[in-house]
A protein has these predicted regions:
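Structural and coupling elements of P-loop NTPases
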Residues: 1-270
Length: 270
């Protein structure tokens, strides 16, 4: 109650299944509803945990069950969320065709979306997988997109959804859904649209509205020093680090002149 927005009814309550208890590390969890269904009490669960019987906890209280239930029961669907979200995160004309489509999360409207995260896979030479959300229109695997902040047009090579670290290909992604793609790299927080909808006039193109910049409350908390064994590999190191800086907007990269080492700092695993 102390931190919820004024005038809102936000709150959490274990008895209403808006609180889950468990362990992400060990893969188990429960809500009040799940305990009732299984005829268990919290004391039973904690006794098993104290005994170290993680296998029993995973088999009887798998973590995916309470997490999925809470998403379904408590999070608003994209259509409902867009009504109050878009006026706060998008700076364009809400009465325009695009503005109306964004507020309705309309899959038939103009394509508009945002890159929210970048995954760099060390198993594939730090290939960048861009993850984001379509807020309007339908994203097709044959589309080319215009990056409003970067002012560049890019074609995608693969479009799909992520399953852990793998991309599952799908032909199109309608508004309201998350997606993942290969083909290019850009900073997280970038707004994109269909390249076919970009105004011919450069001044108009430069003034296209973007989504609000992602705000991060954290500062870099982990640092690692890097030194190339072969000076000829400096360019390769710079290429990988530049990808990392785009993936983690909080990251910093500097040269320690005394040691000759490069210092990379960020909040993501380095």
């Amino acid at each position: 109650k102390k931190i919820r927005p004024e005038g809102s009814g936000w709150g959490v309550d274990f008895a209403k299944n808006s609180v889950a208890v468990g362990s992400a590390k060990h893969g188990w969890g429960f809500t009040y509803e799940i305990l009732l269904e299984k005829g268990l009490k919290p004391q039973d669960v904690f006794a098993k945990y104290k005994e170290g019987d993680i296998q029993w906890l995973r088999e009887n209280l798998p973590l995916d069950e309470p997490m999925l239930r809470m998403v379904v029961d408590h999070l608003p669907n994209p259509v409902e969320a867009s009504k109050y979200r878009i006026p706060h995160i998008w700076g364009g004309d809400l009465d325009s065709e695009l503005g109306q489509s964004l507020q309705k999360s309309d899959p038939k409207g103009p394509l508009y979306g945002m890159i929210t995260k970048i995954f760099l896979d060390p198993r594939r030479g730090y290939q960048a997988t861009l993850i984001g959300r379509v807020f309007s229109g339908t994203f097709d695997h044959t589309d080319s997109v215009y990056l409003i902040g970067g002012r560049s047009t890019n074609r995608i090579k693969r479009l799909g959804v992520m399953e852990i670290t793998d991309l599952l290909d799908i032909p199109r992604v309608p508004a309201g859904n998350l997606f993942a793609l290969y083909g290019f790299i850009c900073p997280s927080g970038e707004t994109f649209m269909s390249s076919n909808d970009v105004p011919k006039n450069k001044e108009e193109a430069y003034q296209l509205p973007t989504f609000e910049k992602i705000q991060y409350a954290c500062e870099p908390v982990v640092s690692r020093s890097i030194k190339a064994q072969d000076p000829q590999q400096i360019d390769k190191l710079t290429t990988v680090v530049s990808k990392w800086l785009q993936a983690d907007p909080t990251a910093m990269y500097r040269l320690d002149k005394e040691s000759g080492e490069f210092i990379l700092s960020g909040i993501d695993p380095l």
